[in-house]
């Protein structure tokens, strides 16, 4: 699997610790039970790495959520049209529809 070669013992220990502490989030993100476990720390580190080009950072639970956040940040909403390719994953279309915009297939 591409990418495995960059995972060393430090990363393996961090991942194991998260599993051992029962703080793994799969499909439903950063709920109150998990208290944003490691997420806010990670966001701050990202902000530091990309500063000053990036004013703020936000972690989301899925690619669909990321598309929704990006569309909202751009002010996309009812009355707008968003062009996307027709051969695509359904989440792209769902995110556009969720904003109230109209999907235009390219």
Regions found by a protein language model. Give the residues of each.
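Conserved PLP-binding active-site segment in aminotransferase class I/II-type PLP enzymes
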Residues: 1-72, 77
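PLP-dependent aminotransferase-like
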Residues: 72-106
């Amino acid at each position: 699997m591409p990418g495995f070669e960059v995972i060393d013992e430090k990363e393996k220990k961090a991942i194991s610790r998260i599993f051992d502490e029962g703080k793994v989030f799969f499909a439903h993100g950063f709920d109150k039970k998990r208290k944003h476990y490691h997420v806010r720390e990670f966001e701050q580190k990202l902000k530091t790495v990309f500063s000053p080009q990036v004013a703020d950072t936000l972690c989301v639970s899925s690619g669909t959520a990321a598309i929704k956040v990006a569309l909202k940040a751009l002010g996309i909403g009812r009355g707008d049209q968003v062009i996307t390719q027709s051969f695509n994953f359904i989440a792209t279309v769902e995110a556009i529809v969720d904003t109230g915009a109209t999907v235009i297939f390219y």
